[in-house]
From Swiss-Prot:
Belongs to the methyltransferase superfamily. This is Probable methyltransferase-like protein 24. Probable methyltransferase. One of its GO terms (cellular component) is extracellular region. Residues 44-63 have a biased composition (Pro residues). Residues 91-100 have a biased composition (Low complexity). It holds the Pfam family Methyltransf_22. InterPro entries: Methyltranfer_dom, METTL24.
């Protein structure tokens, strides 16, 4: 005779099967969620605040404000790609960045390309002769120099600050149309005949001199004086925060602050700071905004923050000038100042002067 099952036993087995199936489904669902990760929901999330998974969240590290980690990562990345004119560190100040609609074409360069040694001996004699020959040999002919034919003031200039007025380089046309702009970088020089002459011819002239008493002075209709010193670096952010009106800037920063995109003529007499300033103009592609360069160079010592053996210093100088040539600047005038000490790196050698005035024209300038 068959045994009867206890009441409800079959239902119990069924319940256990159902519970097991539910448990298995739950475990699988958890595994899928873990595999997907917290970032996957953001792919389909609508625009707006970032999606955050429900539940408790870890607090930020001690001393770190909420959301700071995300902002810091974004800042570092954008800082590396930022144009070098912004100073390279710290929160950008108003006017420090390139104008809208004018994106930088290249990333920043950190050093110039050194030219090969002049000879296998890597000696001072080899480097000096190559350099002196280079600065004494013009690369392009200019038939009309200076502003004598246009100037209302016929007195002779005190120094040979020569500009090229050949029609093919457009400066004479800009002067006649009162549309030229001159930047003059100096350190307390009383010789302003060149600036006054250019202003009298209708050029917009900005002279930067840290010895000026007021921040900005309008000397005449077209001549401005600014109490600013052009450097090869912007002030450190900590210093800038304490002195928001610091009078030291890179030329690229000045251009951005003034809203100027082009300089027809850049004249510089920086008393041995010219090498580092020129290096900065090269590395940050500011040269593309300049039509003609007139630099007084000093050779009696290496210059500010230029170091190394004598031969390596001269090689650095030569490499800077070759960078100008590679950017389509051509030397059209060279003046050897015999009134200055005849010294070359503190030595009376090579029949060299300690001071030369060199003028270049940007052959691609329009």
């Amino acid at each position: 005779m068959a045994r009867e099952r206890p009441p409800g036993r079959g239902c119990g087995v069924l319940r256990r099967c159902l519970l097991g199936a539910v448990l298995l489904f739950g475990l699988r669902l958890c595994a899928e969620l873990r595999r997907a990760g917290p970032g996957s929901p953001t792919r389909s999330a609508p625009p707006g605040p970032a999606w955050r998974p429900p539940g408790p969240h870890l607090p930020p590290a001690p001393g770190q404000p909420r959301g700071a980690s995300r902002r810091q990562v974004t800042y570092v990345r954008s800082g590396r790609r930022a144009p070098p004119g912004g100073g390279g560190s710290g929160t950008p100040e108003p006017g420090c960045c390139a104008p809208r609609g004018r994106p930088r074409r290249k990333g920043p360069r950190w050093h110039i390309d050194l030219q090969p040694w002049a000879g296998s001996a890597q000696s001072l004699d080899e480097e000096a002769w190559r350099f002196l020959r280079y600065i004494s040999t013009t690369q392009i002919a200019c038939n009309h120099m200076n502003t004598d034919s246009l100037a209302t003031d016929s007195s002779p200039t005190h120094k040979p600050w020569s500009v090229c007025l050949d029609d093919r380089f457009n400066l004479a046309h800009q002067i006649r149309n009162k549309q030229c702009r001159l930047y003059s970088l100096g350190l307390g020089s009383d010789d302003t005949h060149f600036e006054v002459s250019m202003a009298n011819n209708g050029c917009e002239v900005h002279r930067f001199d840290p010895s000026v008493k007021s921040a900005h002075i309008l000397e005449s209709q077209h001549l401005w004086y600014h109490r600013l010193s052009i450097d090869w670096r912007d002030p450190h952010p900590a210093v800038a925060a304490q002195k928001p009106h610091s009078n030291t800037r890179k030329l690229g920063s000045i251009l951005n602050e003034f809203g100027h995109h082009k300089i027809d003529v850049l004249k510089a007499d920086l008393e041995s700071a010219e090498w580092k300033v020129l290096e900065n103009l090269i590395l940050e592609d500011v040269l593309e905004q300049i039509g003609q360069l007139i630099f007084e160079i000093h050779l009696h010592w290496p210059g500010f923050e230029v170091s190394g053996s004598d031969s390596s210093v001269v090689r650095f100088w030569y490499s800077l000038l070759k960078e100008l040539e590679q950017k389509d600047f051509r030397l059209f005038h060279s003046y050897k100042d015999l009134s200055k000490p005849q010294l070359f790196l503190k030595k009376d050698i090579f029949n060299a002067s300690s001071c030369y005035t060199l003028s270049w024209v940007n052959t691609r300038w329009k």
